[in-house]
A protein has these predicted regions:
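RNA/tRNA-interacting regions in translation and RNA-turnover enzymes
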Residues: 31-285
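Serine residues within intrinsically disordered or low-complexity segments
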Residues: 3-5, 26, 32, 38
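Intrinsic, low-complexity polybasic segments
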Residues: 14, 29-30
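Intrinsic low-complexity, disordered N-terminal segments enriched in polar/charged/small residues
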Residues: 9-11
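Serine/threonine-rich, low-complexity intrinsically disordered segments
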Residues: 4, 13-15, 23-24
Length: 285
């Protein structure tokens, strides 16, 4: 390792990865994990590291999206994903359609009917430093746009699409792999905090948001699980995802779930100039 690297903060126990170091917050820090003392990263070394990263990330994706039980903490997963993105950026020839950087979400479960999204459900782009944030702003302005930013809180739960016809909730679906998700309409209808009818709504409306479990509800659920001798959920995100994807809607109803709506995806007969306008419109419904 180079003198610029930080001390190891954690060790992976998975056989496919011997160890991994979080370096200082800089772009060259991530690459220092595969950099030789001469400062040159050989293609074969990069290819090997890319394959290791993809294996661990894909494994965690399956656990995260399909079983709601990831092994990695969020900061560990983010660090691995960031390293993979940087290696692929430096070596474009290593990018493949199957890479986890080229798609989002997981495979829809066989427990629920499948739903094909009319508009693909994408994931957010990450920024881990002020430099990356400034770089994003520069790219926006270089495209001839003078932006006014809307800053929202980031809530970790399960992404969900809600579709309304004439103000009535007709379908709710998870993101799945971004193209095909799971039909969780019955469970969403059991969540008190999600409106089943909207006033003054257009003929068709689709909003997207994050179904989450508030900390108070999470603590209550964990206490109940411990009393019953069951293993408690690892964190509120896993609890929210596991609760929403229950086969019995009555279980979902008792979990205290809520939703944070962050996007107006479709709105028949209406048009908006800014994201802020769409949020104001959603609040009016």
């Amino acid at each position: 390792m180079t003198s610029e690297s930080a001390a190891p903060l954690f060790i992976f126990t998975q056989p496919e990865v011997l160890w991994y170091t979080i370096a200082k917050e800089s772009r060259r820090g991530a690459l220092s994990r595969v950099r030789q003392e001469s400062g040159t990263v050989e293609l074969e070394q990069a290819k090997k590291r890319v394959e290791e990263l993809r294996a661990v990330i894909e494994k965690n994706n399956r656990l995260y999206y399909d079983q709601d039980a990831p092994e990695l903490e969020d900061f560990e997963y983010d660090a691995l994903t960031r390293e993979l993105k940087e290696l692929e950026a430096q070596y474009p020839e290593l990018v493949t359609p199957a890479s986890p950087t080229q798609h989002v979400g997981g495979t829809p479960s066989g427990r629920f009917a499948k739903v094909t999204h009319a508009v693909k459900m994408e994931s957010l782009l990450d920024a881990f430093s002020y430099d990356e944030l400034r770089d994003f702003d520069r790219r926006v302005r270089d495209a001839g746009i003078e932006p006014e930013y809307v800053v929202e809180i980031k809530i970790d739960g399960l992404s969900c699409s809600l579709e309304y016809e004439n103000g009535e909730l007709v379908r709710a679906s998870t993101r799945g792999d971004g193209v095909v998700g799971e039909d969780v309409t019955a469970n969403v209808r059991a969540i008190k905090k999600i409106p089943k009818k909207l006033k003054n709504a257009p003929e068709f409306l689709e909003v997207r948001g994050e179904v989450y479990m508030p900390h108070e509800a999470f603590q209550h659920l964990c206490a109940e699980q411990e009393l019953q001798g069951a293993a408690p959920f690892k964190n509120p995100r896993n609890a929210a995802a596991g609760s929403l994807r229950q086969k019995d809607a009555k279980i979902t109803a008792g979990r205290g779930l809520s939703i944070f709506v962050f996007n107006l995806q479709q709105c028949e007969g209406r048009s908006f100039k800014t994201h802020h306008e769409t949020l104001d419109y959603i609040k009016s419904l």
